[in-house]
Curated annotation (Swiss-Prot):
This is sn-glycerol-3-phosphate transport system permease protein UgpA. The lineage of its organism: Bacteria, Pseudomonadati, Pseudomonadota, Gammaproteobacteria, Enterobacterales. Belongs to the binding-protein-dependent transport system permease family. UgpAE subfamily. Residues 33-80, 131-156, 229-262 are periplasmic. InterPro entries: MetI-like (IPR000515), MetI-like_sf (IPR035906), UgpAE/MalFG_permease (IPR050809). It is a multi-pass membrane protein. The complex is composed of two ATP-binding proteins (UgpC), two transmembrane proteins (UgpA and UgpE) and a solute-binding protein (UgpB). The gene is ugpA. Coiled coil: none annotated. NCBIfam families: PRK10561.1 (NF007852). It comes from the Bacteria. Part of the ABC transporter complex UgpBAEC involved in sn-glycerol-3-phosphate (G3P) import. Probably responsible for the translocation of the substrate across the membrane. Keywords: Cell inner membrane, Cell membrane, Membrane, Transmembrane, Transmembrane helix, Transport. The chain crosses the membrane at residues 12-32, 81-101, 110-130, 157-177, 208-228, 263-283. GO terms for cellular component: plasma membrane.
Length: 295
């Protein structure tokens, strides 16, 4: 059986339909990326009026900067905490839906609410709750003799931004995990239950392998989220402190480019971060899409 391929009457119509997206891509992605690559090879004055080609000197200076290396490892640590915690917590809440008999719709709606909150608003919300002097959570912590002050304790500051970032991303992960779990044929679960397999073993032996593609997809998405979209949380909650302990790569780019006016160094850092994101994207399409197989 042959199928005819639809043909546009005007050969310009397909190009006209994709033109808006192409224009947006060029203006907001390709052009800024090209500008960053160009400035990363220049020595630029603080106002961007004059520049001099210096080749890879900015990158060499970058990797000899101890503060940049520290921010790199901070980003790795922060991204790992956010990604692993976010995926595990979201998967746990998605798996609980099966065991909630009453109020499941309310539970699902409640899980989706954080996604509607802006990242900066989420940070401010948890700042109020963790306020050293008047916060509700810090009040209960003080009852147990624990002194909380994230403005002076780098470990507490890291916990705060990780907690707020994970809370903000739970809804997104929950939605995908819930859809993936619901797509599993019930006959497999029921057959395993009849054979005497317990719920925990059913989850790890049946459900978890079947949702592996979604899990790997969310792994890449959450890593990119931790690299980029957590900037408002870090800025509103800690401003990268204390003592630059929460200064990630994206926040260091902002601080040096917009506050320190070091455009060349900021551009070089942007190129490095762009390279990392490209690597993550390649991993997604080359590994996630091709290596995950059902047996």
């Amino acid at each position: 059986m042959s199928s005819s391929r639809p043909v546009f009457r005007s050969r310009w119509l397909p190009y006209l339909l994709v033109a808006p997206q192409l224009i947006i891509t060029v203006i907001f992605f390709i052009w800024p990326a090209g500008e960053a690559l160009w400035y990363s090879l220049q020595s630029v004055d603080p106002f961007g009026f004059s520049s001099q080609f210096v080749g890879l000197d900015n990158f060499v200076a970058l990797f000899h900067d101890s503060y940049y290396i520290d921010s790199f490892w901070t980003t790795i640590k922060f991204s790992t905490f956010v990604t692993v915690s976010g995926l595990l917590v979201s998967l746990f809440f998605a798996a609980l839906v099966e065991y909630i008999v009453r109020g499941s719709r309310f539970y699902q709606t409640l899980m989706l609410l954080p996604y509607a909150v802006a990242p900066a608003v989420a940070a401010v919300l948890w700042i109020f709750l963790f306020n050293p002097g008047r916060g509700l959570i810090t009040h209960f912590l003080a009852e147990f003799g624990y002194d909380w002050n994230h403005a002076q304790n780098s470990g507490q500051a890291m916990f705060l931004v990780v907690f707020a970032s994970v809370w903000k991303q739970i809804s997104y992960n929950f939605l995908f995990f819930y859809a993936a779990l619901q797509s599993i044929p019930r006959s497999l679960i029921e057959a395993a239950a009849i054979d005497g397999v317990g719920p925990i073993r059913r989850f790890f032996k049946i459900a978890l392998p079947l949702i592996a593609p979604v899990s790997f997809f969310l792994l890449v998405v959450n890593l990119v989220y931790a690299f980029f979209d957590t900037f408002p949380v870090i800025d509103a909650a800690t401003s990268g402190g204390p003592v630059q302990a929460i200064t990630t790569l994206i926040y260091k780019i902002y601080r040096e480019g917009f506050t320190g006016l070091d455009l060349a160094s900021s551009a070089a850092q942007s190129v490095v971060l762009m390279f990392l994101v490209i690597v993550l994207t390649v991993v997604q399409f080359r590994y996630v899409e091709s290596k995950v197989r059902y047996q």
